[in-house]
């Protein structure tokens, strides 16, 4: 019997949710990226991201029996968006985006551990 893991996103790390997008002060111009996003392109994983216009975010991910939730701050620095979860959430995170790369119509995800997989796509109304 061969078993395959279809969700290789696990990379247990609570190092203040390492971000590879250097933190900068939240700029009003970043508000253009504020909105509600859904993760696409990762099998058997559901995730939502809400980037608020005030520089705060809410994030949720479910895979198998693991549910992850975080709130915190976000910023845009050049072509990347960084997320920093509040400490009460970060200490429990096993899966978390370390970087979101801004593309034309979506945010490509790099997870803790450096794996790129999936993209957050803005919800349509």
What are the residue ranges of the model-derived segments?
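Lipid interaction determinants
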Residues: 9-125
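Bacterial N-terminal signal peptides
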Residues: 1-6
